[in-house]
Regions:
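N-terminal accessory targeting/assembly segments
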Residues: 1-196, 207, 566
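Glycine-rich phosphate-binding P-loop
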Residues: 242-274
Length: 566
C-alpha cells in the first residue's frame, strides 16, 4: 500500500495536466488514522463525482461492542456516524475551487428513518469502519487543479474523519443514547406480539410533519394523547415505563371529520415499520414491521396473480385465478395488491379510503338493488376483511370518512377530533345496530397457493452492458424496462430504490430460472443481505449508495417490473 505522501507527490506531478491523468490516483493510501481508497475517478469535472472510501481499523475507531452487539444497534450506530460525518464535511463542500463539480464533498443524506446503508458499514466482527463518499476532483476547465484536491484530502478530510468517526472524539453519552433508544424501540416491537397489538403510539408523540415536502416534525403541533380505554403501559429497558395507545389485533376503523388528523395518524403508522431518530416525534410510534399500505394503482402491470378472492366472472371470461394485465383498473390493482401482500408475509394492512377504489371497498344497498350481486364481479374488501383476520391472522387498520358500513365489521373504532383520538367503539356499534349490515353473496374464502415462478428476463440481462437509472423515489429503469414504484408509499429514500435496482438485477442474473417460486427468490435475496451484507450487491456502473428495503418492498418491486413474467 502506498503512503499519503506518495499520493501528495503524485498529485503534484499531474497538476495542470489534462483531466484523465487523475485516473492514475486510483488505489489505496495510508493516512495516519485511516486508509483512503480512491475507488472511481470521474471522467471530467462535469461528470458524477469520484468515489472515495475511508477505512478505519477497529482499534482506531474504538467503538465499544455494546454499541453494536445486535443488528439493529449496529444499523443505528452506522446511521448516527453517517450523520455526524455529513455535518463535519458540509462546511468544506465546494470550498476548493474549480469547474463543474470541482470541490464537492458528499455523502448519503439520511432522512428521519434509520436505514441500513452501504455509505457507512461497521464490521461487527472487528469493529472496523468504512465510509463511502463522493469528491468532485477539481479542475480549471478540463485541466487538473491538483493543489485544490490536496487541500481537500490533506487539509479538510483528516479533521472531519477525526472528529466524526472516532469514538474518542464523539460524545460518549450521545453514542450510548443511540443504542439505548434502539433497545427501547426494539423492546416495543417485541411487546406488540406479547400484548396482542398491531401498533403503539406513545403519549406525547408528534405525528404531523412540517410541510407536504418536509418530513421534519411540525412546530407547535398537538402532542398525541391516548384515549384511556386504549392506553397501554410498557416497560422499556432504558426509558422505563412508557404509556400510549395500543391498537389491538383485528379490524380497526379510524374515523372523523375532514382535516381532524385521520390520515396523519395512518401515515405515522405507515412509517412506524422503521425506527426513527431522536427528536423526530415518532421515535415511539411502532407498527408491526410487516405492515403493508394498500391503495388502488391504476395502470399498473399484474402478472399471473390469483385475484379470485375479490374478482371473478369478468366480461370476456378472463381467468381471475391467473390474472394478468398491462393496464390494471383501480379495483383489480387493489385486489392484486392485497394478494401480493399476503404472499409477501404481511400481518397488517393499512388502508385509506381516499386512495382506494370505492367499488373495491364497499357497495351500498341501493347499488346492490340496482346492480344484482350476480352481475357484479367484485367481492368488496368489506366482505373479506373479517376472514383475513380470523383465518389468516392479518389485521387491518382503515381510515374512513364517508361510508359507515365498516362499523359492523370493526373490532375497534377510533375517532380523530381536533387531532386527539377517542375510542368510540361502543357508541359506533350501538348506532350501527340501528342500520342493516352490509351483506352480499360471496364465494367461499380460499387463499392462493402462491406458486408463481418468475421466468428469466432477457430485457433485464440480455445486453452486454446493463444500464441502470433510478429516478428519485419514483421508478427504476433497467435498460428499457421501467418499474414504477410511485404507489409504494412505504419507500422513504431514493437509496432504497438503488437497493431495489441492485436486488432486481441480482435476482434476474442469478435467481430467477423459472423453477424457483417468487417467495424462494426473495428468501435468497434476503439471505445474501443477511450473510454477506448489503454491500455485496454493489457492482461497477450501478447505483453506488444503497439502503436496504424491507422484504415487503422487494416483493412490491418484483411484482411491478413489467418485463418479469410469472
Amino acid at each position: 500500500m502506498q503512503s499519503a505522501n506518495d499520493l501528495k507527490q503524485l498529485l503534484f506531478g499531474i497538476n495542470h495536466k489534462s483531466y484523465p491523468a487523475y485516473k492514475s490516483t486510483r488505489g489505496a493510501y495510508q493516512f495516519p488514522r485511516y486508509t483512503l481508497s480512491i475507488d472511481h475517478v470521474q471522467g471530467d469535472p462535469f461528470a458524477a463525482p469520484s468515489r472515495v472510501s475511508v477505512h478505519i481499523n477497529g482499534k482506531t475507531a474504538a467503538f465499544p461492542t455494546s454499541l453494536y452487539d445486535t443488528y439493529e444497534k449496529r444499523v443505528a450506530l452506522q446511521d448516527y456516524l453517517l450523520r455526524q460525518f455529513a455535518r463535519a464535511i458540509a462546511p468544506y463542500s465546494f470550498r476548493a475551487k474549480g469547474s463543474g463539480k470541482s470541490g464537492l464533498l458528499g455523502v448519503s443524506r439520511c432522512g428521519q428513518e434509520i436505514l441500513e446503508r452501504t455509505a457507512c458499514v461497521l464490521n461487527p466482527s472487528d469493529g472496523s469502519l468504512i465510509v463511502n463518499m463522493e469528491i468532485g476532483f477539481p479542475a480549471n476547465g478540463r485541466t487538473i487543479a491538483s493543489q485544490e484536491l490536496i487541500r481537500i484530502l490533506f487539509d479538510f478530510l483528516p479533521g472531519c474523519v477525526e472528529k466524526s468517526l472516532l469514538y474518542r472524539s464523539l460524545d460518549p453519552k450521545a453514542c450510548a443514547g443511540v443504542a439505548r433508544l434502539c433497545e427501547d424501540q426494539q423492546a416495543i416491537r417485541a411487546a406488540l406480539k406479547e400484548k396482542g397489538l398491531t401498533a403503539f403510539i406513545a403519549d406525547g408523540s408528534i405525528l404531523p410533519r412540517e410541510t407536504g415536502v418536509s418530513d421534519l416534525p411540525m412546530k407547535h403541533a398537538v402532542p398525541f394523547v391516548s384515549p384511556e380505554s386504549l392506553r397501554v403501559t410498557l416497560y422499556l429497558p432504558n426509558r422505563g415505563s412508557i404509556s400510549g395507545m395500543g391498537i389491538p389485533l383485528g379490524v380497526t376503523l379510524i374515523v372523523g371529520g375532514g382535516f381532524h388528523g385521520k390520515s396523519t395518524l395512518l401515515q405515522a403508522l405507515e412509517r412506524g415499520v422503521y425506527n426513527h431518530i431522536a427528536g423526530d416525534g415518532r421515535e415511539y410510534v411502532i407498527t408491526d414491521a410487516s405492515a403493508v399500505k394498500l391503495r388502488s394503482e391504476d395502470s399498473r402491470s399484474i402478472s399471473n396473480v390469483d385475484i379470485s378472492l375479490f374478482i371473478h366472472d369478468l366480461p370476456g371470461k378472463s381467468d381471475t385465478t391467473s390474472f394478468s394485465t398491462a393496464d390494471a383498473s383501480g379495483s383489480t390493482s387493489q385486489a392484486a395488491n392485497v394478494i401480493e401482500g399476503i404472499e409477501a408475509g404481511t400481518s397488517l394492512f393499512l388502508i385509506d379510503e381516499d386512495t382506494s377504489a370505492t367499488n373495491f371497498m364497499v357497495r351500498d344497498e341501493l347499488m346492490q338493488r340496482v346492480v344484482a350481486d350476480s352481475e357484479e364481479p367484485i367481492t368488496p374488501f368489506i366482505s373479506r376483511v373479517r376472514d383475513l383476520y380470523e383465518k389468516l391472522g392479518i389485521s387491518s387498520i382503515l381510515v374512513a370518512g364517508s361510508s359507515g358500513s365498516y362499523f359492523h365489521v370493526a373490532d375497534t373504532v377510533i375517532q380523530m377530533k381536533e387531532y386527539v383520538p377517542y375510542d368510540i367503539t361502543e357508541r359506533a356499534k350501538t348506532t350501527a345496530a340501528e342500520f342493516p349490515p352490509f351483506t352480499a353473496s360471496v364465494r367461499p374464502f380460499a387463499v392462493p397457493s402462491f406458486q408463481r415462478r418468475p421466468q428469466p428476463s432477457k430485457a433485464l440481462t440480455g445486453s452486454d452492458r446493463t444500464k441502470v437509472k433510478v429516478m428519485g423515489r419514483e421508478s427504476i429503469l433497467i435498460n428499457k424496462s421501467l418499474t414504477d414504484l410511485r404507489a409504494v408509499e412505504q419507500l422513504t429514500d431514493s437509496e432504497q430504490l438503488n437497493g431495489l435496482a441492485a436486488l432486481l438485477l441480482d435476482a434476474a442474473e442469478r435467481r430467477m430460472d423459472g423453477r424457483k417460486t417468487l417467495v424462494q427468490v426473495v428468501d435468497l435475496l434476503e439471505r445474501q443481505m443477511d450473510e454477506k451484507g448489503l454491500a455485496s450487491l454493489l457492482a461497477p456502473g450501478r447505483p453506488g449508495d444503497l439502503a436496504r428495503p424491507r422484504r415487503q418492498e422487494i416483493f412490491e418491486c418484483l411484482d411491478r417490473c413489467r418485463e418479469l413474467k410469472f
